């Protein structure tokens, strides 16, 4: 509740999605959904669980690099938000959309160097190499796909709030590049998670309150960067 309140008081609209891979105990997930959180899933198992718990497809974010054709068919049919990780998935999703006679809104997962954390390059499309630009082009020319969102996840237990500010600004720069060179219109950013907890003392030997920044420090920089970077959008 505090995290939600902190972000919503600084920027609007904000959507929180509960990561099922973090804890998919039904009772925990239900509490998060009662607090208006969406479901963020990375597998068919997690997707099925979210639906069984009553989460509608349009409130599910389907992440992960290994989605099957059957999983994508169900997600598309139920209106889930699909994040694509690699070119093969773009081709598979295009085939699914065509077979179902739908235009599917797509979010691209990006990876890049923020300058503050070790780059997570295993998943998503790299900006620096031009891979992300190429993937965006492939989506843009498809009559069955529509690029509407950008996603990145820069790590876990990140104790430097400026890493998130850099993340937002890099994503915004890439967004402007796409929008200035095509008909693409980005509607939202998914900035992942990774905020440190004072209850999870990973490699920390001092009292957590001396090491872990308050959530307000993260929200100030993230929301401030979002406001600045989107202020003059057409």
What kind of feature is each model-predicted range?
Residues 12-188:
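Active-site-proximal beta-alpha core segment in soluble small-molecule metabolic enzymes
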Residues 159-234:
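C-terminal active-site-proximal or functional interface alpha/beta core segments in diverse enzymes
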């Amino acid at each position: 509740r505090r995290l939600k309140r902190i972000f919503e008081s600084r920027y609007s609209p904000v959507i929180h999605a509960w990561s099922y891979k973090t804890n998919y105990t039904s009772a925990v997930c239900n509490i998060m959904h009662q607090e208006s959180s969406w479901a963020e899933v990375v597998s068919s198992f997690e997707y099925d669980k979210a639906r069984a718990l009553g989460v509608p497809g349009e409130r599910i974010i389907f992440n992960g690099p290994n989605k099957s054709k059957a999983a994508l068919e169900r997600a598309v049919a139920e209106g889930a938000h699909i994040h694509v990780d690699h070119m093969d998935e773009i081709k598979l999703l295009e085939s699914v959309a065509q077979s179902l006679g739908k235009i599917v809104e797509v979010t691209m997962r990006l990876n890049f160097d923020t300058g503050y954390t070790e780059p997570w390059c295993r998943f998503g499309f790299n900006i620096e190499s031009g891979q992300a630009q190429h993937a965006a082009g492939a989506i843009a020319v498809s009559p069955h796909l529509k690029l509407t969102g950008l996603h990145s996840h820069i790590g876990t237990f990140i104790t430097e709030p400026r890493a998130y500010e850099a993340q937002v600004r890099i994503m915004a720069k890439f967004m402007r590049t796409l929008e200035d060179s095509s008909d693409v219109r980005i509607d939202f950013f998914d900035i992942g998670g990774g905020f440190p907890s004072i209850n999870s003392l990973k490699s920390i030997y001092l009292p957590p309150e001396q090491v872990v920044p308050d959530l307000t420090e993260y929200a100030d920089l993230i929301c401030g960067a979002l406001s600045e970077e989107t202020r003059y959008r057409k």
